[in-house]
């Protein structure tokens, strides 16, 4: 294998194989857009396979799904940080969605803990959601206000689910996933990772 090939990411090499460049010879920009989109899909598929494959093998599938869905439910409207490198993203995902469920799976929580935790989460959604990134600035004040409202409503809905669910350990896992999302929108996290906060200000 040549040094050049070794340095090209697997997702990019797979995208090159799946897309015939000859078909796009008259539209280089279109080719690059399609290739980039396919790379993103391949990266996410591979990351999903790694995370859920390990969760399945270790008997943590339900716990992983619970933490992941709670995280995604809030992230849908509150956005937040993304890892800048695929390897970092995969390692963070394994920590959040496999290691954390393993650690917290047998820790029960009662509804008082749920109320206290989600009050903290709701406050963070009010103060910091939505949080953008350098590659995805959230432009438009009205747009951001709508996202904030939806993020807060989503938090209240998830609070209700956590309160009503009869399994004490499941309550804990829902809170863990939700707190991961709080970390991703908190300005302190941006500062610690030396990432730019309020990226929309550059365009408004």
Curated annotation (Swiss-Prot):
It is a multi-pass membrane protein. It is an enzyme of class 3 (hydrolase). InterPro entries: AgrB. It holds the Pfam family AgrB. Its main location: membrane. The keyword Transferase does not apply. Keywords: Cell membrane, Hydrolase, Membrane, Protease, Quorum sensing, Transmembrane, Transmembrane helix. The chain crosses the membrane at residues 51-73, 87-107, 111-131, 151-168, 173-190. Its EC number is 3.4.-.-. Signal peptide: none annotated. One of its GO terms (molecular function) is peptidase activity. One of its GO terms (cellular component) is plasma membrane. It is found in: Cell membrane. One of its GO terms (biological process) is quorum sensing. May be involved in the proteolytic processing of a quorum sensing system signal molecule precursor. Belongs to the AgrB family. This is Putative AgrB-like protein.
